[in-house]
Amino acid sequence: MIEWFTYDPAHPLLFTQFYFWAFFAIVYAGFALIMQRAGSSRARLHARNIYLMAASWFFYYKTSGIFLLILAFITISDFLIGQQIPRSKRPKLWLILSVCIDLSLLFYFKYAYFFTNIFNDVFGTNVQVFDIFAFIGNGFSHDGRFLVDRIILPVGISFYIFQVISYAADIYRGKIKPVTNLLDFGFYVSFFPQLVAGPIVRASEFVPQLYKPFFLTRRQFGIAVFWILNGLLKKIILSDYLAVNFIDRVFQSPMLFSGFENFFALLTYSMQVYADFSGYTDIAIGVALLMGFYLPKNFDSPYKSRNPQEFWRRWHQSLSRWLKGYVYIPLGGNRTLFGRPASKLLSSNFNSFLTMLIGGLWHGASWNFVIWGALNGVGMIINKCWRAMNEHLRYVLMLLLTVSMVVARQLTNSAYPLINMIEVWVLIVWAGTSIWYIGWLWGARTTNRFIAWVDNAWDVLQTFVFISFTRLFFRSASNLDPATANREAWATAKQMVNQIGCAWDNSIIWPFMQEYKYVVLLFVAGMIIHWLPDRFKRRYRLWFAAMPLPLIVLAAAAVVLLAYQFITADMQPFIYFQF
């Protein structure tokens, strides 16, 4: 029984564990009791917020231990600063203070190793990180239980730091008024369904809900259950199975697998990370909805995107909206460059690229994450420039690039893996561009649905492959010790590029399909379901929600039994826990 109330870093409260659902059942029982018996409507709301904040803090303690103190400090700090912003004659100074405090903590815990390594590389020194918080903790414990030579990243700090920054910024902009009760504000910051892995809930989206009475219709209950079951299926059947049975093996030892296997691992990793992250979000949305709270949508079938810009409008939407509202637009959006008049295309491209770099660093303190963010930024810029070109110019430039690559190959006989990959990619894009150009010439005189469908499918395929390739750097930098992340991540990425660029053997494709048939089938099934029309998906959600309660219970039991058949021996944590 004592284990329920003690922190165990090896057993955090995960949505896929029985312990979480036991915790939620107890919390929900208390929640229902409060909503039925706690006096007036205002008293019920106040009691509900305090109760759920206490439950959320317990949840975070079970997930991150003593780092609950960091969450408490951030809560108190931003609450007090938020009170001062509308009262002060210089509100911007208070906003700057809030942002500086929040980002200082984020930089300390997340980027200390990254910038220390840069400093050592530049100046040839051997500076080591020092955990000042562990040092202070040892002063109170008298037994030196905390390691001072290692900085541990608190779970979810990137998410709740961005939330409190949005709170101060929204007050400054006049979008919301400061929360007058510290406990209500603490509830907003720490609401447990989305605390450790999002979605990032901006203050203007959630604070008004603090004062709305609980309301849950029969249909909303069904929708909430649907999202929970949908998330569990995504996480356990798709994400975990693909990871354990194929993806992790390839990324751990890329040189033991052929170029095709490495390439297919990149494609399946795109499915894994989507199923994992959107699965968490689905469960969070469902759990929150059962308590009458609405969390923002975080994914909108991102692999239907026709270009990188559209992808980032559909993927991790809460982060994309945050970056747009608090980074891209303050930088000037598509209006200016360094405060001076500039072309719309140039300024928007610069700001987009810088925003993607920041987004890459938000995910992790490694050069691989910087490269990942930069690649996405470059992809967006190229696509913007491409779409701004005349159709004839597009084809001519693509033809010239292809001819140049072929001539360079003949003259240099290059054997660099990355060059090989670029050459293949250019040839494929040229072939697709040629087909598109012929179709465009024909379609300029007549409308053809088939040509339009092929054009759309080609754009979707190109975007999916491009995004999957950028994730080579994302995945290789994940789940690593921050002290050695740069070196290990770069080695993995380099090995995979070598294999994909040089060790390609078509003869192993069919044996591979036979050996990993369940992996291939799950990947294909996942993509087909993902590409289903949104209209159809909405219909089967509503159909599920409209079922009689006994049938919903039976469906839930069936899903749990099915998921149990796929569950792995070692529970896989959610990918975005590390961010």
Please identify what each model-predicted range represents.
Residues 1-527, 531-578:
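Membrane-embedded transmembrane alpha-helical bundles that form the catalytic cores
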